[in-house]
Amino acid sequence: MITTTIRRMLSTVALQRAMLSTSSALALALLAPTEAHGQTDYYNTDRGRPVQVEDAYVTERHAFELKLAPVRLERTNGGAYNWGLEPEIALGILPRTQVELGVPLAFMEQGGVRRSGIAGLDLSVMHNFNVETEGLPALALRADVLAPVGNLAADRAYSSLTGIATRTYSWARFHVNGQYTFGASPASSSAATTLGGPGALDVSRWFAGAAIDKAYPLSSYLVTAEFYGRKPLDSSQAVEYTAGTGTRFQLSPTLALDGGFGRRLNGPEQGWYVTFGSAYAFSIPALFPGAR
């Protein structure tokens, strides 16, 4: 009888250990990230998320990045509020090359009149030429086309080219952007929006700026600051200067959040702004069956 009792006790202990091992394995499987490419998305700065000056790196090949409604709110010194919203999706279509589609939306106050609607269709291609070396920064080129789609869009299409450089040191990264936009000035003042929203909403003849950021890998977040100047499409307007700062945080292996604030230092739209956005990284294996 004693032997039987001991055997039952040993069987119970073995069963408990097996259940514990199974539960632990299941928990690890559930908690393990399924999309490794999204784990460092906080480290890659995109235009408008949360600053306009971006780095020279692109979305991984065969990976998608869904930018979930990056929002920018501006308040001018005159008390007018402007909203910018541009949902985007990017695809790493080739090695070191991404394509991106965005639909900028605008909510503006002009002369006491509120207007809202689609401000265009933004198509872009970005290519990263190289990884950084001891003597050469990472370099990239982006080409954009803003199509005249929507009731708040310009009356013609605009194309632009942007050169990007990124240099990394042990204590910080530095980025330099320079952009030029081709095309005549808009015929209507409403189309020549000076709303400095994410992406296509900030249409200017030229743009030049620099940014610095610092990453904290153990906490999965990054802080950044920028300063840039932009010349409006209207040649009669002076160059506008803006300073801003922000942060990006990796909430999960596939989801990153960002936020920032800053101030336009001069110009007719002088005032402050805040931004908030998120990005979800994922892949669709069925679309790329041969990818590894």
Which residues are covered by each model-predicted region?
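Transmembrane beta-barrel domains of Gram-negative outer membranes and organellar outer membranes
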Residues: 38-292
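N-terminal signal peptide c-region/cleavage motif recognized by signal peptidases
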Residues: 32-33
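N-terminal secretory signal peptides that target proteins for export/translocation
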Residues: 1-15
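Cleavable N-terminal signal peptides
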Residues: 25-26, 36
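Compositionally biased, intrinsically disordered low-complexity regions
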Residues: 12, 19, 280-282
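Sec-dependent signal peptide recognition
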Residues: 7-8, 17-25
